[in-house]
Amino acid sequence: MRFKELVFLLKIDEEELLEKLYEEGFFNFAIEENKEGDRLLRVYLREGETLPSFLSNWKILDERLTTPKDWMVELEPFEIVEDVVVDPTEKVTRTDKIVVKLSPGVAFGTGLHPTTQMSVLFLKKYLKKGDRVVDVGCGTGILAIVAKKLGASYVLAVDVDEQAVEVAKENVQKNSVDVTVKRSDLLSEVEGVFDLVVSNILAEIHLRLLEDVSRVTHEKSILILSGIVDTKEDMVREKAQKKGWNLLERKQEREWVTLVMKRS
């Protein structure tokens, strides 16, 4: 599949950008920094797809036709956290580390973003072998795949976006792991009880998740919430506390915060 790639100078903060893109159901994008330190937004349009409306008056810096393989070619394998390697090339054969083969399809979710890195860090720390895990808002499926490779007995990955579900299924297959992937608006299609819930989405969506997450967890379950901009951390923590979740640990990279919680 060929895409039209458009490059813009990022004029708004990253959290506001993600909100606007998600509101329009747009997931084909990447955020990067050039040599001059400018933040750039790359968006990828399928044939017949329209540009998100808020970008219509932004100046286009560059435009070209491309494919998912084209935009991944510049990415080399990299260690997202200690002993966990993301491999966009599918050429890494080492067995001394957890290797995640990744074909994004959508650009966001390659593992380069600090929210993904912090989520993986806490999965390594809190996931116990044999745990049942659900990844809510799975995107490319990277967190679900890591959870399975860390020893989870059962992993469910859900996303409201059909395209993300298809990409996650493709990545699960590439990694030869047993992960169930399906479409669900947060936990609406999720049944059963899980030992660990991980979710790397926006703060406002976490508020919705917290309304229902107790239904699929037990008193010792761990909840990892990432994708929270620091100015909205208190809002999420207050909601979590009201719903019976206590803070175990937090980590911040740049303006992004990840929280680890346990039922009180």
UniProtKB/Swiss-Prot annotation:
Which parts of the sequence bind S-adenosyl-L-methionine?
116, 137, 159, 200
Where does this polypeptide localize? Cytoplasm
- Mind telling me which CDD domains this protein's record contains? AdoMet_MTases
Q: Which cysteines are joined by disulfide bonds?
A: none
The catalytic activity, as recorded, is:
L-lysyl-[protein] + 3 S-adenosyl-L-methionine = N(6),N(6),N(6)-trimethyl-L-lysyl-[protein] + 3 S-adenosyl-L-homocysteine + 3 H(+)
- On whether S-adenosyl-L-methionine is a keyword of this UniProt record, the answer is yes
Q: What class of enzyme is it?
A: transferase
| Name listed for the protein in its UniProt record | Ribosomal protein L11 methyltransferase
Q: Which gene encodes it?
A: prmA
